[in-house]
A protein has these predicted regions:
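Short, compositionally biased
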Residues: 48-67
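Structural detector for short beta-strands of small beta-barrel domains
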Residues: 1-7
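Short, charged beta-turn/beta-strand-edge "cap" motif at the junction between a beta-strand
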Residues: 42-48
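Short, structured beta-strand/loop micro-motifs enriched in basic residues and often containing a Trp
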Residues: 16-24
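Short aromatic-glycine-enriched beta-strand elements
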Residues: 10-13
Length: 69
């Protein structure tokens, strides 16, 4: 799984498989890509995996709100 962590100087700094950070050229990502999106390789670039992104956001949100219960 590749998750966009942040953008720096024309690159997306991404977490790959929870183990390492990789740099992906911003040109290879959809214009709508943002921090926290899960992306997968597709052709010569990457696409956003909307289902995985939403599932991940929900998990993070549940953990966050669980801290206050």
């Amino acid at each position: 799984m590749i998750i966009i962590d942040r953008f720096e100087e024309g690159f997306a700094i991404c977490e790959k498989d929870g183990m390492e950070l990789i740099k992906i050229s911003r040109d290879l990502l959809p214009e709508t890509a943002k921090e926290g999106d899960v992306v997968v390789a597709f052709g010569d670039g990457y696409i956003i995996d909307s289902d995985a992104t939403e599932k991940r956001r929900k998990t993070v949100e549940d953990k966050f709100f669980g801290l206050f219960n």
